[in-house]
């Protein structure tokens, strides 16, 4: 069976009932939104570690959208991030509730499926908050922050000092000549992550293929006196 009016779509086949076609369409939509769009690269990498198979990511997301009445709605970019975070919150709660208190008997170390993925890499909601904020800012210097964003006010001093240092002696923002530190802080963005690092998003320098801003990660040196380049803990 198929729709007789545009858009022409298959509704069911000899082998697939209508319910399965709808389910596959939901999975297709999730792949398009969260993978093919290229707007969630860091978060997708983490999700691949959390789930046993990539297909489970999109199947679970499609089920979450359907269960919460989110399908068939034109969501904003920011809303897609909010939805993904709520999905992750729910998954986190389910994992915590299903974690057995006792250790598994000897000889039972080999695990398969989703449980293996959950125990292989201990990912927390903080890891995903960091990856989602990275994905948001690497695309654009957003003005409206999502509800799950961490409070940046405790790090105002560090951010201010970073841009003042760049104004005085540019090291990372060499294409911002003629702009003072306050202007630089508006044109670029420095985000404190929950893993203790800072990420600088440089919107004057973008990847020609993805359009993503150049991102440089920093942490304070052992003396705590200056920021030095750092590798991320998860992303």
Task: Mark where each language-model region is.
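A structural motif corresponding to the C-terminal lobe/cap of the Radical SAM core domain
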Residues: 1-55
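Generic preference for well-ordered secondary structure
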Residues: 5-8, 68, 72, 116
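Generic preference for hydrophobic/aromatic residues in regular secondary structure cores
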Residues: 10, 129-133, 199-201, 218
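Context-gated lysine
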Residues: 14, 25, 45, 49-50, ...
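An accessory alpha-helical subdomain
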Residues: 39-94
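Hydrophobic, aromatic-lined core segments that form the binding pocket/scaffold
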Residues: 73-179, 183
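Charge-dense, extended regions
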Residues: 151-235
């Amino acid at each position: 069976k198929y729709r007789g009016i545009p858009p022409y779509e298959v509704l069911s086949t000899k082998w697939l009932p209508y319910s399965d076609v709808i389910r596959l369409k939901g999975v297709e939509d999730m792949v398009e939104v969260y993978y093919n769009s290229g707007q969630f690269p860091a978060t997708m990498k983490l999700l691949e570690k959390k789930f046993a198979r990539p297909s489970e990511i999109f199947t679970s997301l499609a089920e979450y959208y359907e269960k919460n009445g989110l399908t068939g709605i034109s969501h904003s970019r920011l809303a897609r991030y909010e939805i993904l975070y709520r999905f992750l919150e729910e998954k986190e709660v389910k994992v915590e509730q299903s974690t057995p208190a006792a250790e598994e008997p000897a000889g039972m170390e080999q695990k398969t499926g989703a449980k293996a993925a959950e125990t292989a890499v201990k990912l927390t909601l903080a890891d995903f908050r960091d990856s989602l904020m990275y994905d948001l800012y690497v695309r654009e210097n957003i003005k409206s922050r999502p509800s799950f964003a961490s409070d940046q006010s405790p790090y105002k001093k560090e951010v201010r000092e970073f841009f003042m240092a760049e104004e005085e002696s540019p090291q990372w923002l060499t294409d911002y000549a003629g702009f003072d530190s306050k202007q630089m802080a508006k044109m670029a963005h420095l985000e404190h992550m929950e893993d203790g690092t800072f990420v600088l998003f440089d919107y004057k320098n973008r990847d020609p293929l993805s359009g993503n801003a150049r991102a440089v990660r920093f942490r304070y040196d052992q003396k705590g006196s200056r920021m030095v380049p750092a590798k991320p803990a998860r992303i």
